[in-house]
Amino acid sequence: MSTATDTAAPAKKRGSGLFQGLQKVGRSLQLPIAVLPAAGIMVRLGQDDIFGKDGLGWDKVAAVFNNAGGALTGSLPILFCIGVAIGFAKKADGSTALAAVVGFLVYSKVLEAFPVTEAVVQDGADVAATYNDPGVLGGIIMGLLAAVLWQRYHRKKLVDWLGFFNGRRLVPIIMAFVGIVVGVFFGLVWEPIGDGISNFGEWMTGLGSGGAALFGGVNRALIPVGMHQFVNTVAWFQLGDFTNSAGDVVHGDITRFLAGDPSAGIFQAGFFPIMMFGLPAAALAMAHTARPERRKAVLGMMISLAATSFVTGVTEPIEFSFMFIAPVLYVLHAVLTAISMAITWGLGVHAGFNFSAGFIDYALNWHLATKPWLIIPIGLVFAAIYYVTFRFAIVKFNLKTPGREPEEEVEDLTKA
C-alpha cells in the first residue's frame, strides 16, 4: 500500500508542476496584451473621421497616429516574444528581453529562406514572395525558449579565456542558434500546421452561433485556473486572415477587426452585454442580498466594481467575489456568457475591443462595428436576467456571497 502511495505522489507532483507552468504561461501573455489599448487609441485617432479628411482635416497628423498604431499591431509577434520571456522567467532583466529579441530576429529571417511562393517580377506589377507566418504563436514559443534558457544559463561560467561571455552575455548567443533551429523547423512544417489552424477557425466559424457560444463558455470556464489566455490568444490573434490597406496580412479576430475586416468581431461582440450590463447587475444583486447591517458597505464596494466593469471591461474583481465561494453562480455566469455570444452572432453583431469589452472600447470602435447599437438592448435584457437569477440563487441556496458571510468570519477579517 505504501508503494502505491509513493508512486502516486510523484505523479501528482508532476501534474501539479505542469499545471502551475501552464498557469504561469497564461499570466505571462497578459504583459504583451497590455499594449493593445495604446495601439487601438492611436489607430482610432488616425482614422479619417477624427484627424483625417472627414474630421479635422489634419491628414499628416492622422497619418502619424495611424502609422504609430500600425507599428504596434503589426509587431505583435515580437511583442509577445519579449513579453512572454520577461513574464515567464524568474527575476528577468534586460538581458532576458535581449535574448528573446535576438532569437526572434534570427528565427523570423530564417523563415524567409523557405518561401511558400516565389517573387515574380513582371511588367506593371511585381508580386512579392510569401512566407510561412506562425504569427504570435511563433513569438510565444521563442519567448518561452528565451525564458527557459535564460533561467538555465544566465549564471553559467565558461572557461577563463571565454570569461567575457559568462552568464547573461551567453544567453543571447545561445538564442541566436536556437532561432535558426526554430526557424528551420517552422519553415519546413508550418504549412500543414497553419492549414490546421485555418481549418479549425473555419470549423468554429461554420458552427455559427454554436462556435461563438463554445468560445465564450470556455473562455469564462478557464478563468478560475488562469488558462483562458491560451484560447484567447488562438481566437483573437491567430484565427483567420485579412489583408489590410497597406497590403499586410493580419491574423486573429482582434487584429483583423482593428484593421477593418468587416467579418471580424464575432469572438468579441458577445462579451459587451455581459461586461457592461450583466456583471454590474450581478454585483447589484449581491449587494441587495447582503445582510442589512453590511448592505451599505457591500453596496459601496459593488457599485465601484460595477462601474469598473461597465467603463473598462475589467470584470475579475466581480467574478472573484463569487467564483470560489459560490461556484454555482460562476457556472451560471459562464452559461450566460455563452448565450450572449450566440445571440450577438445570430443577430449579426460584430464589435471588438483593444483591451476589454467596456464602454471605452465600445465607443472607441463604434465606427468599425456592425450593428453596435444592438448591444445596448441585448445588454439590458442580460442585466435583468443576471439580477433575477443571481438574487434568486443567492437567497434560495443561502450562498455566502459578500455581506452574507457568517458573523465570526467578518470578525476575523476585521481583526486581521
UniProtKB/Swiss-Prot annotation:
Induction: Induced by GlcNAc. Transcriptionally activated by AtrA. Expression is repressed by DasR in the absence of glucosamine 6-P (GlcN6P). Residues 16-406 form the PTS EIIC type-1 domain. Keywords: Cell membrane, Membrane, Phosphotransferase system, Sugar transport, Transmembrane, Transmembrane helix, Transport. Its main location: membrane. The chain crosses the membrane at residues 68-88, 96-116, 130-150, 170-190, 196-216, 266-286, 298-318, 323-343, 344-364, 375-395. GO terms for biological process: N-acetylglucosamine transport; phosphoenolpyruvate-dependent sugar phosphotransferase system. Disruption phenotype: Mutant is unable to grow on GlcNAc, while growth on glucose, fructose, xylose, mannose, sucrose or galactose is not impaired. Mutant is insensitive to GlcNAc. The phosphoenolpyruvate-dependent sugar phosphotransferase system (sugar PTS), a major carbohydrate active transport system, catalyzes the phosphorylation of incoming sugar substrates concomitantly with their translocation across the cell membrane. This system is involved in N-acetylglucosamine (GlcNAc) transport. High-affinity permease, which exhibits a narrow specificity for GlcNAc. Essential for C-signaling between vegetative growth and development. The EIIC domain type-1 forms the PTS system translocation channel and contains the specific substrate-binding site. This is PTS system N-acetylglucosamine-specific EIIC component. It comes from Streptomyces coelicolor (strain ATCC BAA-471 / A3(2) / M145).
